[in-house]
């Protein structure tokens, strides 16, 4: 079986897993919001271990943003390093993908509402809400799902 993972490592980021479920390919989508605890990420990735799985991961490669403070840059770097550590430890092959590269694939810019619109078009049955109580679609879920789709298109 094949699984394609997309990770938006930001503070409001997410991990998305597209799992091939049938032939012709149909995909199950799993979205996990970022939390202070990496356990949900680890469990999602560990469930795809073993010789019967082919896993490919696209990790968004972003740097410091203009105007960010030292503390927020440090926190982002910490999270980014933790995610790379988890992927490396679990032997999940991953590619660092700059936002401009994966966004070009979908014909979008940095406007988060565009990301959500493209996600809804590609995955009309997937909820992008962070929690059931949310009213607004989550751009972290959208970015992670688009990264997973980018991985599927390039490594599928």
Where are these regions (language model features)?
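Phosphate- and other anionic-substrate recognition elements at nucleic-acid/protein interfaces
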Residues: 1-156
């Amino acid at each position: 079986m094949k699984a394609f993972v997309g990770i938006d490592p930001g503070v409001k980021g997410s991990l998305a897993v597209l799992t091939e479920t049938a032939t012709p390919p149909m995909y199950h989508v799993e979205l996990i919001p970022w939390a202070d605890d990496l356990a949900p990420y680890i469990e999602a990735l560990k469930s795809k271990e073993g010789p019967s799985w082919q896993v490919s991961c696209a990790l968004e490669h972003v740097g410091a943003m203009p105007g960010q403070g030292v503390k927020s840059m440090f926190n982002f770097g910490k999270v980014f390093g933790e995610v790379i550590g988890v992927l490396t430890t679990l032997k999940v092959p991953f590619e660092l993908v700059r936002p401009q590269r994966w966004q070009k694939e979908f014909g979008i810019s940095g406007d988060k509402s565009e990301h959500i619109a493209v996600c809804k078009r590609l995955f009309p049955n997937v909820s992008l809400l962070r929690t059931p109580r949310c009213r607004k679609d989550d751009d972290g879920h959208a970015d992670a799902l688009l990264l997973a789709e980018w991985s599927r298109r390039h490594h599928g």
